[in-house]
Amino acid sequence: MSSSTYPAAQHVMVLYTGGTIGMQASANGLAPASGFEARMRDHLHSQPELVVPQWRFREMSPLIDSANMTPAYWQQLREAVVDAVDVQGCDSVLILHGTDTLAYSAAALSFLLLGLDVPVLLTGSMQPAGVPGSDAWPNLFGALA
């Protein structure tokens, strides 16, 4: 199926891997932080004009800075994507990922997910969600819509 023939997504799985998009201040500077689903829902509720499909959320473990991405983590992502589609019935998957290695992960997943007939998108941000001027929410909700 070519990308131009995918119907609009109805049930999206959002997989959160960490990365800048969900980082928060820690004793050691910015670090991937859990609890991003609640922050995402809060932001969505504060923007009633945003129209997005139904979505579910899964926080990967461990959350990582994408500079620490590994082939083993790509396998975890593959398993999470396949589970979202085959077990949970999602018709698309959005992966929230750090920008340092996003392109490498996209390339790896393009091979690891051969034959999977749903769109898989990756997005990230240059600044954490909630930071003034951040591109996080526009990138996330632009990809989700």
Show which residues each predicted segment covers:
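Active-site histidine-anchored catalytic micro-motif
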Residues: 2-145
